[in-house]
Design a protein with these regions (language model features):
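Long, intrinsically disordered, low-complexity segments
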Residues: 19-20, 76, 118-121, 192, ...
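Short coil/turn linking the two alpha-helices of tandem helical-hairpin repeats
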Residues: 162-169, 212, 230-242, 456-458
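Conserved, well-structured interaction surfaces
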Residues: 40-41, 45-49, 53-59, 64, ...
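Bacterial N-terminal signal peptides that target proteins for export
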Residues: 1-7
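Bacterial Sec-dependent N-terminal signal peptides
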Residues: 3, 16-39, 155, 197, ...
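An aromatic- and glycine-enriched ligand-binding surface/loop that stacks and positions planar moieties
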Residues: 20-92, 202-203, 217-224, 229-403, ...
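Bacterial N-terminal signal peptides
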Residues: 8-16
Length: 592
């Protein structure tokens, strides 16, 4: 069974480190549990479960999670060239619109909420660790494992903070709550923070068992996989002021390769047979899932259960059977990026060509233009295009499912939703809800991280090519989307090939890897962070913005500023709670 991420309200009332709507820095003990209870297995498990529960939102699974989505659709995709904000126009969730056009400041509420809730999550881990450290193995069963699990979770929360905000305060369970406001956010730089987090993951991996009795509980290979991710980020050495990538740390890259090999050698992971299985609940804890946030439905908590509230603003709107708010829409550039050449390989010159599948709506009829070029089949696994079959829904194809088509176009996101006729979808509000897990790390990541490390090392490029081709082969053998009116035909001219050995230089391999990461991981909350890690955010985003201005006037003032926009500003509220100790990230206005 899944590890349960739910807690009774009475326990929430006595947590010694609760969170309110002000700041994690302002917390005071709200109650206490006896030492006898807290140093028992049952008492410790309550604190451990609270730290796990924070993966889905530390205040529980409610609508408030929309303001700090754990899926990072706002912070990692709308901020990139992959997606538009969507919804009911630029004024609808204007704070996210500001992220999209690079016009954020330290007063942005979505940033303050994200910071606050991630630190609440860190605080839960510290609370559990403090109790676990003070107890003995005789008092608490599985004590060593629980300590390691909490360190992995804490490192996960800190990693999110680091890649979002750069300048962050770091404290562990040995720091008292009342001392939190006295810790500066520039005591450790990015490299030092990532070193700490990678070490925590490695130390935890030495203790954790290879398997756990409950699905969702952290084990050895989750820690190793996450260590690989952190070390891959750290390998790209950044200038502290400009955020430019100045060098590559080859020792760290070799460690990434070794860690990925250990995960693969475990024999427990593989790619799912069909890409579309990633969005089916039957496969959510299958062979591709390495680390996932576990969700549940109709479990007796909240209105629908511990569902993924992070994405519930994003269910298709308009006339769709989901009746949703229609946020988070795929960009035209992402659609175009799926075009392939005559060999089924990515068309690296797609931006110099007409838009693929651009739509016109006349009355109630859509016309899709320029649909003769070949495309990667993952396009229609990821994007809901007008007139194209939507999953297994038989009543009609994707149609007018976007709320503000004049601003954002006609395409919607197909990932992360179960088909509307499925019994796995919740009936009624919240719209489109299901208990589909959120994949933090999946096996495709392991393959692509290893390939990236090998390419940057300039070593064993052939193996890197084979790893990329593994991912492409899975897409090639997946069941293609069929024409809605004639299921004997494919919905598009799908063509995907494998990279040959000829011409596979380091430069070409790097471009191929980065394109593959985009196509395979589209809309999974990682794109913007990838661009920053690779040191290509300024060029990529300003080229994208220049093209978008032609069709979307709200991009008129948008501009990515190097040395600033790689990271979000430290929130103003948090500066106040630190008694003025925090320093702001480069390029942003001083705190007020």
């Amino acid at each position: 069974m899944k590890i349960k991420y739910m807690m009774a309200a009475c326990f929430m009332a006595v947590l010694t480190t609760g969170c309110n709507e002000d700041s994690f820095l302002s917390q005071k003990p709200q109650g206490s549990l006896s030492e006898e209870i807290m140093t028992s297995t049952d008492g410790a498990e309550l604190l451990v479960n609270a730290a796990y529960a924070a993966l889905g939102g530390p205040e529980g699974q409610t609508w408030s999670v929309w303001c700090h989505p754990t899926s990072n659709w706002t912070y990692g995709e709308v901020r990139s060239d992959n997606a538009y904000k969507g919804g009911g126009g630029v004024g609808d969730l204007n704070e996210v619109h500001r992220m999209e056009i690079f016009d954020v400041d330290a007063t942005n509420g979505f940033l303050d909420s994200k910071w606050y809730h991630l630190y609440c999550s860190v605080q839960r881990c510290n609370s559990a660790l403090k109790v676990l450290n003070a107890a003995t193995d005789e008092q608490i069963k599985e004590r060593s494992s629980r300590i390691a699990e909490m360190k992995v979770l804490r490192a996960h929360y800190y990693f999110e903070l680091s890649r979002l905000f750069n300048k962050i305060p770091y404290f562990d369970e040995n720091v008292e709550i009342q001392d939190y406001p006295n810790i500066k956010n520039d005591e450790f730089d990015r490299n030092e923070i990532l070193s700490k987090l990678a070490l925590e993951m490695m130390d935890a991996a030495d203790v954790l068992p290879a398997t756990q009795p409950e699905v969702g509980r952290i084990h050895k290979y989750i820690a190793l996989a996450y260590a690989a991710k952190i070390k891959l980020y750290q390998a790209y050495q950044q200038d502290a002021t400009t955020h430019a990538v100045t060098s590559m740390n080859k020792e760290l890259l070799r460690e990434v390769v070794t860690l990925c090999d250990k995960v693969t050698a475990s024999g427990r992971y593989d790619l799912l047979d069909d890409f579309q299985q990633l969005d089916l609940i039957a496969y959510e804890n299958g062979k591709e899932s390495v680390f996932a946030i576990q969700y549940s439905m109709n479990d007796g908590t909240e209105s629908a259960g511990r569902i993924n509230w992070s994405n519930l603003l994003n269910s298709p709107g308009g006339s769709s059977p989901y009746h949703g708010d229609g946020f988070f829409l795929p960009s035209q550039d992402l659609i175009d990026a799926y075009q392939t050449d005559e060999n089924g390989l990515p068309d690296f010159n797609y931006q110099q060509k007409p838009h693929y599948s651009w739509a016109e709506l006349n009355g109630d009829l859509f016309t899709l233009n320029n649909t003769t070029p070949a495309v990667d089949p993952r396009l229609d696994f990821v994007v809901g295009r007008p007139t194209i079959t939507w999953k297994t829904y038989k009543e009609g194809p994707c149609h007018t499912w976007v709320r503000d088509m004049g601003t954002y176009g006609y395409n919607c996101a197909k990932r992360f939703w179960v088909s509307p006729e499925s019994s796995d979808m919740f009936s009624g509000w919240p719209w489109g809800a299901s208990h589909l897990n959120w994949q933090v790390i999946r096996y495709a990541d392991i393959l692509l991280w290893k390939a990236e490390a090998l390419i940057e090392l300039g070593e064993d490029l052939g193996t890197a090519r084979e790893l990329i081709n593994q991912v492409r082969e899975r897409a090639r053998r997946s069941a293609y989307v069929k024409d809605f009116n004639d299921p004997s035909k494919d919905a598009a001219r799908y063509l995907i090939g494998l990279y040959p050995a000829a011409g596979w230089t380091q430069t070409y391999a790097r471009e191929a890897l980065r394109r593959e990461v985009r196509l395979e991981k589209a809309l999974e909350g990682e794109r913007f962070f990838d661009l920053v890690r690779w040191g290509i955010a300024e060029k990529t985003m300003n080229n994208y913005i220049a093209a978008e201005k032609e069709g979307r006037i709200y991009y008129g003032s948008a501009h990515f500023t190097a040395g600033k926009d790689e990271y979000y500003p430290v929130p103003n509220n948090q500066y106040g709670f630190s008694h003025g100790l925090y320093t702001q990230n480069p390029g942003y206005a001083p705190f007020k």
